[in-house]
Structure formats: structure tokens, C-alpha cells
Amino acid sequence: TLFSFHKVILNTVSVPEAGYWHQGVQMAQRSAATLSKGPRFQVSKGLMTVLVSTVVLFVLCSLIAPTSVSSGPLGSMIPFASILAIAGLGQMLVIQQAGIDLSVPSAISLAAVIVTKLPQGDNDKLLGAVLTALAVAVGVGLLNGSLIGFLKLNPIIATLGTNALLFGFIMFLTGGIPSSSSDLLLGIVGGTTFGVPNSAFIAAIILGIVVLALRKTVAGRRFESIGSSPAMASVSGLRVRIHHGMAYVWAQILYAIAGIMIAGIITVSNAFMGDAYLLPSVAVVVLGGTSLLGGRGLPTATVVAAVFLSQLDQFVLALGVNFAIRTLVQAAALAIGVAIYTVDWSRVRLALR
């Protein structure tokens, strides 16, 4: 019986391992009990918070800076929000494993440069350039994953070094000379369908794939369980290092897609195109409610947070402030997001009494 098997396991493993195994059995029993009650739709705290914040922001924009919510500015905001959403989803996969990826700027720039430099405006060569950009992204992800997942280097140091390496490669590849996008890429990514930017549809498809992969596949559920408790996952026999490393691979693929998209919106690519996405890619993950300590990712909330942060930037821009203030606003949004989800506000209220 299951009870007898449970006793045998407890008698043959060490005390810490037995504790982890016992916790795993209890979690499985609770999950089975929940499933037996039938499906339930649940909205996470992160998604609800960022949804309400986004609605409030749009209301404020319509009252204080109406031009920021007119068709023109919104049409300009949506493509870049879509790019940020995809980059944020990549960062989310890494943060789920209690890591962080600082190679975002050069990873995005490299993909943009590849899909503009290789075709040289030739539409027939675009597909090969896109496949090359994705293949390079996989290689960069394997490098980051090996350094962090297997060699146990600090994620900040490892990815910062990778970012510098990629920047040097971009400068070698381009010689500091910008390259132009092909008409086909501009038409696919920069065009519209039924009045909606194509980039929004691409971001929605990517979001759907990420949600299905994390929620509906065995590999995705294992990925999330490892992020929640690496020690318990290791005792359960899951390959923690491989999953940690693969998070960086999938993240790089998403960064590459973001880079390809930005090349399809901005006609000229250079080595600095991705610089604006380092802080925001982390901010949207935090604002969406994913813990910096790892655990369950919230992809839908991350995408909504990308819309929130992009519109916030548009709002500040409509007020006529300079770039430095816009950066401070992004940093403040990140700090507020961390405070909302990590501070024990019950203790704060008790301390203030």
C-alpha cells in the first residue's frame, strides 16, 4: 500500500530527505483534493494588482494628459510594449529559478543586427537571418546556462560578462555602422491587421505558448516546482541544474524574438538598441508579482505589467519631462513593485501603532 511504501522510504533515507519526501506527499495529496473539487478559475494577486493599476493609469492619463491615450500615441506605444512583454517573459523564466539575466541589452541588439546585417535588405535572405539569430541565441543561452547551472557562477557576474562579450561581437560584426531592415521584416512586424499592430498579435502568441508550456506540460510543471523548492525537487529526482540552465536558453530565444521585432519597427539597427530594456525587463516581472526569490511565474501579469510600464513612460513623456526623469520613474516603479510583494505590511502596521 501507499502507507507501507511511505514507511519504507522514511526508514531508508536521511532525516532531511525524509522530511522533503513527506512534504512532497502532503502537497500531492492536497493537489489531488483540490482537483477532485473540479476546476476553479483563480486570479493571482499579482495579476489583479497590475490590472487595477493599469486601469487607474489609463484613467489618470485621460484626465491629466489626454493626448497620451489618443490613437497616435497608443499606436506608437503598443509595439514597444509588445517587445518589452516578450523580453519580460524571458526574464521571468530566469527569475523563476531565482536567477537574473543582465545580458538582455546585447542579446536584443545582437538579434536585431543579425536580421538586418545578413540580408542587407534582401527579402529572400530574411528567413535565413532569422534562423541564424535564433541559433545564436540558443548558443548564448547554453553559455549562460552552463556558467550558472553547472559551474555555479553568480548569475549577475556571469550574465554581465556575457553582455560585454556580446557587445564586443556586435561591434566586430557591424564595425559601428548601422544596418537597415528589409521591407519584408518591416511589413510583417511593423504592419497592422484590422488596425491593430502585428507586434501585439506576435506578443499574444508568445504569451499563449509560454502559458501552455508552463501550465499544461509536465516539463513546465517540473520547471515551476524546481523554482519553488530546488531542494525538494532534487530529492524527488528532478534535474535541477539542467532546468536552471535551460531557463537561460529559453530566455535568450525570447530576447532574440524581441530583437527581431524591434528591427522590424525601427528601420535602422545598431549595437545600443537593447539598452533600454534591461531595467524594464526586470521591472515588469516584479510588477507582475513573480518573486525575485524564485517560484511560480505569472506570464499574463508580466505582459500586463509591460503595458502598464510602457503607458507610464508615454504618460511621463506627454508631461514633457526629460529622459533622466523617465528612468527615475521606471526605477521607482520597480521599487514599489518589490515593496508591494515582499514587505510584510501587517508588521509595518503594527510598528506604526
Spans of model-derived segments:
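Structural signal for alpha-helical transmembrane segments and their membrane-water exit/capping regions
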Residues: 53-70, 97, 170-178, 211-218, ...
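Single transmembrane alpha-helix segments in multi-pass membrane proteins
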Residues: 56-122, 146-152, 283-299, 332
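Cytosolic-side transmembrane-helix boundaries in multi-pass membrane proteins
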Residues: 5-59, 208, 234-242, 316-353
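Alpha-helical transmembrane segments within multi-pass membrane transporters and channels
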Residues: 123-163, 305-308
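Transmembrane alpha-helical segments in multi-pass inner-membrane proteins
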Residues: 255, 265-331
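Helix-loop-helix "hairpin" substructures at the membrane interface of multi-pass membrane proteins
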Residues: 125-133, 139-144, 195-269
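Inter-helical junctions in multi-pass inner-membrane proteins, predominant
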Residues: 64-76, 171, 213-215, 220, ...
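Transmembrane helix-bundle core of multi-pass membrane transporters
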Residues: 151, 155-216, 243-246, 265-274, ...
